[in-house]
Swiss-Prot record:
The modification Phosphothreonine is found at residue 273. FMN binds at residues 311-313, 365, 435, 465, 497-499, 520-521. The gene is DUS3L. A zinc finger (C3H1-type) spans 118-148, 156-186. The lineage of its organism: Eukaryota, Metazoa, Chordata, Craniata, Vertebrata. This is tRNA-dihydrouridine(47) synthase [NAD(P)(+)]-like. It comes from Homo sapiens (Human). Pfam families: Dus (PF01207).
Length: 650
C-alpha cells in the first residue's frame, strides 16, 4: 500500500489529558494561554455548537452514542494495566500478551458509510439523461419511470446552489441531484443556462476512463497480450544475460551509455518490398508491436528537485490531488491499483487511474506479486491510459498484500522482483519507477543492497521511505540511511520520503543528496505545505481559509463523484477520512516553537475562534459537523468510523 495508508488519524478522543500544566515529551509545544483540558475542550464545543445549530445529535450514530472502535484496536490508558483494570502481574499470560499488542493498521469491521434509504426508489438512467429513445434496459428495467413518484420519496435538497449547474450551465444528474431546486422546473424538467452553453463550457477533462467495450473484453478474457507473453517466454527459457535485456529508461540527470544504433532484426521468408496497394491508409503504420523501443527512444522522466505528492491510498483521490496541485505540487500519482483487479475490468479499480487535466506530470501505481499479471497489466496500461510513468508499489506494509507476496514482500523475493521489473520495462513506453522501504524487519536494512540491482534492471527512479515494514510510524524516518542509499543508487535518481511537515524539514532532506522529496502525511495534515516549501515561509492560515479549502474539495468531489445522493455521500466519506488527518494540524500562531513536528501529539487547546477549535477536535462527531457545514445534514442512519488508526505518537 502507498504511503498514505499510514495509521494516520489519532484515536477518537484526541491527544492526551494534558491540561494547562507542563507539556510531556512528544507533545506539540502550544502556548500556555491556549491549553485546556479534555473536559473543558468538549464542553466548549458543545456549548458553542448548541448556539450555532439546532441539531441535538452530535455523534456518529442516530442514537447519539459515539461509535466505539473494534475491541482489537483498543489500547490501555496506562502502562502496566490491562483493559479490564488488572495489573500485568495479576493478569493471565494470554491476557498479558493481548495487551502488549500495538494499535496499528485499519479499523476492521467498521460500519459502511454507503446509504441504503434511496436504493429502493432509484430513477431510471434513461430519464436522468433525458434520453428520447426507449429505456436502456427494456422490459427488464427495475427502476422507476414515474418522475412524480420519485420526487415524492426523494429526500429534501441539501442546499439552494448546485455547483455543476453554476459552473457548466447544466447539471447532468437532473432530478436526482440533491441540489435540484437550483435547476429544476416545477414539472421536473432540467434547466440549462444558455449563456454558459453558448460559450461551449464543458466539465474539466478527466482522462483514463475504462471503455465499456474493453471492459467486456477483459471480463471475457478476450484481450491478447502478445508483448507480455513474449517477455514471459524469455523468463521461462532461463536466466537472460544482462547485456541482452534493455536497461529501460533512465531519468534526466542519470548518465548512461546507450547504443542508439539501428537494431538488427532477423529477416524471415517473404520480407521483400510489397507492391503498392490502391487502398488508402488512415495513418502511419508502425512496428511497435513487433520491435521493442530501445532505451534511448523511451520518454524520459525529468523531475529533479520537484515536489512529489505520494500515492495516498483512500485520501489520495482526484479531488485531493487537485487541491495539492493548486498549492504547488509538481508530480502526482494515482492511488495504488491492484493489477489483477485491473485485468478483470473492475470499474472501482480503473477509477484510481483517472487523471485531471491540471496534473501535468502524472503516474499510476501498481501492486502485484507475480511477473505474468504485472507484465500483462503494464502492457494493457501502455495501450489504454495516458501517464508519464508507472510505479511499482514495493512499500505496502499491510498483511493482506504482504502475505500474498506483494508490497514489501518483493524486497525478499529478488527473482520474482527482477522478472517483474524487466518484464514491465519491455512492454512499457514510459519510465518505470519503484517505491520501496528500508526493509521488512525493523533493524535489518535491505534497500542499500537492492538499489544497485534496481539500477541494473532498468528502473528509472526509486523512492525510498525511511522506515521498515515492522516499524510503521512509531519512530522517525531514518534520513541518515537514506543518505547512504543515495550513494548506493548513483547515478540512478533517488527520492526520499518521511516526516516532512515544514520547509525546514524539506531543506534538511535535500541536504542528504536526494534527487527530490516525496510528501505524504504532511500533505494530508496541511496541503499548503507545498506553498510553504516553495516560498520558504510558515503560513499562519486562518480557520476560514481552511474551511474554504474544504469547500473547494467538496466542489471538486461533486464534480468527480456526482451531485446525486450517492455522489454526495461518497464526497462526504472522503472528506471525513481527510478530516481525520487535518485535525492533527496545529496553527502556527498557537505554537511556542516552530515548526510543528509530525511525531508530536497536539494537546487539547482552544483555538482563536470556534471554527479553529472545532477543526482541532479528534471526535468523529465533530468531523461530521464540519461536513454538514458544506454538504448539508447527514442521512438519518449515517455512521462513520475512520479507516485508519494512529499509533504514530506512541
Amino acid at each position: 500500500m502507498a504511503e498514505g495508508t499510514a495509521e494516520a488519524p489519532l484515536e477518537n478522543g484526541g491527544g492526551g489529558d494534558s491540561g494547562a500544566g507542563a507539556l510531556e515529551r512528544g507533545v506539540a509545544p502550544i502556548k500556555r494561554q491556549y491549553l485546556t483540558t479534555k473536559e473543558q475542550f468538549h464542553q466548549f464545543l458543545e456549548a458553542k455548537g448548541q448556539e450555532k445549530t439546532c441539531r441535538e445529535t452530535e455523534v456518529g450514530d442516530p442514537a447519539g452514542n459515539e461509535l466505539a472502535e473494534p475491541e482489537a484496536k483498543r489500547i490501555r490508558l496506562e502502562d502496566g494495566q490491562t483493559a479490564d483494570g488488572q495489573t500485568e502481574e495479576a493478569a493471565e499470560p494470554g491476557e498479558q500478551l493481548q495487551t502488549q499488542k500495538r494499535a496499528r493498521g485499519q479499523n476492521k469491521g467498521r460500519p459502511h458509510v454507503k446509504p441504503t434509504n434511496y436504493d429502493k426508489n432509484r430513477l431510471c438512467p434513461s430519464l436522468i439523461q433525458e434520453s428520447a429513445a426507449k429505456c436502456f434496459f427494456g422490459d427488464r428495467c427495475r427502476f422507476l419511470h414515474d418522475v412524480g413518484r420519485y420526487l415524492e420519496t426523494k429526500p429534501a435538497d441539501l442546499g439552494p446552489r448546485c455547483v455543476l449547474f453554476e459552473t457548466f450551465g447544466r447539471c447532468p444528474y437532473g432530478v436526482t441531484c440533491r441540489f435540484a431546486g437550483a435547476h429544476l422546473r416545477p414539472e421536473g424538467q432540467n434547466l440549462v443556462q444558455e449563456e454558459l452553453a453558448a460559450r461551449g463550457t464543458q466539465p474539466p477533462s478527466i482522462r483514463n476512463g475504462l471503455d465499456k467495450a474493453l471492459q467486456q473484453q477483459l471480463r471475457k478474457r478476450e484481450v491478447r497480450f502478445e508483448r507480455a507473453e513474449q517477455a514471459l517466454r524469455r523468463f521461462s527459457q532461463g536466466p537472460t544475460p544482462a547485456a541482452a535485456v534493455p536497461e529501460g529508461t533512465a531519468a534526466e540527470g542519470a548518465p548512461r551509455q546507450e547504443n542508439c544504433g539501428a537494431q538488427q532484426v532477423p529477416a524471415g521468408p517473404g520480407t521483400s518490398t510489397p507492391p503498392s496497394s490502391p487502398v488508402r491508409t488512415c495513418g502511419p503504420l508502425t512496428d511497435e508491436d513487433v520491435v521493442r523501443l530501445r532505451p534511448c527512444e523511451k520518454k524520459r522522466l525529468d523531475i529533479r528537485g520537484k515536489l512529489y505528492l505520494a500515492p495516498l491510498t483512500t485520501c489520495g483521490n482526484l479531488p485531493f490531488r487537485r487541491i495539492c496541485k493548486r498549492f504547488g505540487a509538481d508530480v502526482t500519482c494515482g492511488e495504488m491499483a491492484v493489477c489483477t483487479n485491473l485485468l478483470q475490468g473492475q470499474m472501482s479499480e480503473w477509477a484510481l487511474l483517472k487523471r485531471h487535466q491540471c496534473e501535468d506530470i502524472f503516474g499510476v501505481q501498481l501492486e502485484g506479486a507475480f511477473p505474468d499479471t504485472m507484465t500483462k497489466c503494464a502492457e494493457l496500461l501502455s495501450r489504454t491510459v495516458e501517464v508519464d510513468f508507472v510505479d511499482i508499489n514495493v512499500g505496502c506494509p499491510i498483511d493482506l498484500v504482504y502475505k500474498k507476496g506483494g508490497g514489501c514482500a518483493l524486497m525478499n523475493r529478488s527473482t520474482k522482483f527482477q522478472q517483474i521489473v524487466r518484464g514491465m520495462n519491455q512492454v512499457l513506453d514510459v519510465p518505470l519507477t519503484v517505491k520501496i522501504r528500508t526493509g521488512v524487519q525493523e533493524r535489518v536494512n535491505l534497500a542499500h543492497r537492492l538499489l544497485p540491482e534496481l539500477r541494473d534492471w532498468g528502473v528509472a527512479l526509486v523512492t525510498l521511505h525511511g522506515r521498515s515494514r515492522e516499524q510503521r510510524y512509531t519512530k522517525l524516518a531514518d534520513w541518515q540511511y537514506i543518505e547512504e542509499c543515495v550513494q548506493a543508487a548513483s547515478p540512478m535518481p533517488l527520492f526520499g520520503n518521511g516526516d516532512i511537515l515544514s520547509f525546514e524539514d524539506a531543506n534538511r532532506a535535500m541536504q542528504t543528496g536526494v534527487t527530490g522529496i516525496m510528501i505524504a502525511r504532511g500533505a494530508l495534515l496541511k496541503p499548503w505545505l507545498f506553498t510553504e516549501i516553495k516560498e520558504q515561509r510558515h503560513w499562519d492560515i486562518s480557520s476560514s481559509e481552511r474551511l474554504d479549502i474544504l469547500r473547494d474539495f467538496t466542489n471538486y468531489g461533486l464534480e468527480h463523484w456526482g451531485s446525486d445522493t450517492q455522489g454526495v455521500e461518497k464526497t462526504r466519506r472522503f472528506l471525513l477520512e481527510w478530516l481525520s488527518f487535518l485535525c492533527r494540524y496545529v496553527p502556527v500562531g498557537l505554537l511556542e516553537r516552530l515548526p510543528q513536528r509530525i511525531n508530536e501529539r497536539p494537546p487539547y487547546y482552544l483555538g482563536r475562534d470556534y471554527l479553529e477549535t472545532l477543526m482541532a477536535s479528534q471526535k468523529a462527531a465533530d468531523w461530521i459537523r464540519i461536513s454538514e457545514m458544506l454538504l448539508g445534514p447527514v442521512p438519518p442512519s449515517f455512521a462513520f468510523l475512520p479507516k485508519h488508526k494512529a499509533n504514530a505518537y506512541k
